[in-house]
Amino acid sequence: MSDPPVALIANRIHKRFLVKETGKSTQAVADVSLAVQMGSLTALVGPDGAGKTTLLRMIAGLMTADEGRLEVLGIDVAADPQAVQDRISYMPQRFGLYEDLSVQENLDLYADLHGVPQAIRRKRYARLLEMTDLARFTARPAGKLSGA
């Protein structure tokens, strides 16, 4: 039996940011390597400031790595970030959800913005809501979710 195709390959990813107040740089992501198989569920867990959001933004093609190579669905993220953005989405809880809209309304808004066909939304929403354990909160305003 062969292994499932790889959805993500990260090879020795590094990212630094300049701290304006000090003029020094700080390491946000240091030497991260991983492979995620298609169809698998993977979680990034770590304390505040560990680089989780930075790594996700690089994977989604919203930010470039300083070093290393990222490949998403066979696409070199550095070479063609728009192709990655056309295939995947990144929606953070903070600054990504409209707090006055319900969870369902936020899903519909982002699906509209990314051109997700109506025919596949129901199945996709069900999977996302199950993965995030938010199915029972679809009518709740995003600003009233725990952690919001």
Give residue spans per PLM region.
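The feature captures the beta-strand-to-loop junction immediately N-terminal to the Walker
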Residues: 45-47
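Helix-to-loop junction immediately C-terminal to a conserved catalytic motif
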Residues: 60
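ABC nucleotide-binding domain signature
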Residues: 43, 88-92, 108
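Conserved ABC transporter NBD signature motif
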Residues: 68-79, 83-84
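Conserved ABC ATPase "signature" region
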Residues: 108, 112, 119-137
